[in-house]
C-alpha cells in the first residue's frame, strides 16, 4: 500500500454543519508511504472517527477513502484482516491490552500472527523503553504510561506500510515520549513506512512532513 486518499470525506454526523473549517473533512487529502503526518484536533472534531475510518471499523461517511486505487467500502472482512496484519498497524488511544495477560504475552499475541520479531528483539524494545522489569507482570497491574509503552511495542511487531498512532504519548513524560518516538521512527524507516499521528494537544516531538488540522 503506497497511499491512503480521502476524497471529500465527511462523517454523517457533520452533514448539517456548514461551518466546518477542517483540512481533512470535505477536502482531498493524500497520505503517502514514507512520509510523516500529524493530524491535530480539538475535542469533538472527529479524531477518533478519523482513526476508525482508516482502520475500517466505521464507514458512516460520504465521499471516498481509497487504499491506492481501491475504495475501502468495497473491501470484505478477509481484506481488512490482511490489511491490519500486513499494511496498517494501529496504536489505539484506549490501548486495548488484555489486563489479565503479562506485558510480553500481550505483545506476543500480535507477533505470532506474522512471526515478524524474535523474542530477543522484543525484549530489546522493553529494555529500551525502561520496562524490562515489567516483562512478566500482568498489564492490569501496570500504570497507564507503562501500558502505553507496551502498546507501542505491540504496534511495532508486525509488517506495515503505515502506522496510525492515536494520541500515543498522552500519559508519558518528555523523556519517555522522546524514546518512544525514536524507536517508532527507527522501525518506520526500516520498513519504509508512513506515519499518521493524531493528537488533541500533546504529541511526539519530531519532524512532520505535513500537519493537518481536523
Identify the meaning behind each predicted range.
Residues 55:
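Helix-to-loop junction immediately C-terminal to a conserved catalytic motif
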Residues 71, 119-134:
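Conserved ABC ATPase "signature" region
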Residues 72-89:
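ABC ATPase NBD coupling module
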Residues 138-142, 146:
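Conserved ABC ATPase signature
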Amino acid at each position: 500500500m503506497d497511499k491512503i486518499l480521502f476524497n471529500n470525506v465527511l462523517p454523517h454526523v457533520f452533514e448539517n454543519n456548514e461551518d466546518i473549517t477542517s483540512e481533512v473533512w470535505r477536502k482531498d487529502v493524500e497520505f503517502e508511504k514514507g512520509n510523516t503526518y500529524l493530524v491535530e484536533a480539538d475535542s469533538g472534531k472527529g479524531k477518533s472517527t478519523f482513526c476508525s475510518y482508516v482502520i475500517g471499523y466505521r464507514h458512516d461517511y460520504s465521499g471516498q477513502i481509497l487504499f491506492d486505487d481501491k475504495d475501502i467500502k468495497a473491501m470484505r472482512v478477509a481484506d481488512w484482516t490482511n490489511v491490519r496484519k500486513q499494511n496498517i498497524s494501529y496504536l489505539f488511544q484506549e490501548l486495548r491490552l488484555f489486563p489479565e495477560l503479562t506485558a510480553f504475552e500481550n505483545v506476543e499475541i500480535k507477533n505470532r500472527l506474522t512471526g515478524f520479531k524474535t523474542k530477543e528483539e522484543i525484549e530489546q524494545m522493553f529494555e529500551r523503553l525502561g520496562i524490562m522489569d515489567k516483562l512478566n507482570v500482568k498489564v492490569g497491574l501496570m500504570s497507564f504510561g507503562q501500558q502505553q509503552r507496551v502498546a507501542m511495542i505491540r504496534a511495532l511487531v508486525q509488517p506495515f506500510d503505515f502506522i496510525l498512532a492515536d494520541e500515543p504519548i498522552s500519559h508519558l513524560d518528555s523523556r519517555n515520549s522522546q524514546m518512544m518516538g525514536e524507536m517508532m521512527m527507527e522501525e518506520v524507516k526500516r520498513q519504509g513506512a508512513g506515519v499518521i499521528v493524531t493528537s488533541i494537544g500533546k504529541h511526539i516531538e519530531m519532524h512532520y512532513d505535513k500537519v493537518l488540522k481536523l
